[in-house]
Amino acid sequence: MERAAKKEAVESLNGLFQTTSVAIVAHYSGLTVAQMQKLRQQMKQAGASVKVSKNRLAKIALEGTDVAAIGPLLKGPTVIATSSDPVAAPKVAVEFAKANEKFVILGGSMGTTVLNVDGVKALASLPSLDELRAKLVGLVQAPATKIAQVTTAPAAKLARVVQAYASKSEAA
């Protein structure tokens, strides 16, 4: 790799690390190309990304970023998964690791907080931002639905009583 290409790769990675809220580091040795493509697709669908780069260049790119604490994890064949949603990358990484034993999660970072393997798994078990929004909307809408049901219930009961009385009058 030429010096200019290395500089460009470092700048690209640094830009990615500046905008990410979570970074997960894992070993991928032994994965097939098809498995790596599947991982990339799953990450992309979740709104995350996967990067494989030289560890030395990645360490240089990490300098001055919130996720700089993952530097010591970059040893051997590593892949870095990042996302702006704090739950997206960990969730996909943990699910992928369950299906592929050759994909080994080493740890990660959420902002300036360093995560070990258990921390990544705990983060993956949390609901995503979209799921939390859906729950919040459901909680806000529930009282309005209840009020509508309570206000229409007496009118419906009255209508049924009148209908029953009218049916009784016609039958007699």
From Swiss-Prot:
Keywords: Ribonucleoprotein, Ribosomal protein, RNA-binding, rRNA-binding. The gene is rplJ. The keyword rRNA processing does not apply. NCBIfam families: PRK00099.1-1. InterPro entries: Ribosomal_uL10, Ribosomal_uL10-like_sf, Ribosomal_uL10_bac, Ribosomal_uL10_bac_type, Ribosomal_uL10_CS_bac. The lineage of its organism: Bacteria, Pseudomonadati, Pseudomonadota, Alphaproteobacteria, Hyphomicrobiales. It comes from Rhodopseudomonas palustris (strain TIE-1). PROSITE patterns: RIBOSOMAL_L10. This is Large ribosomal subunit protein uL10. One of its GO terms (molecular function) is large ribosomal subunit rRNA binding. It comes from the Bacteria.
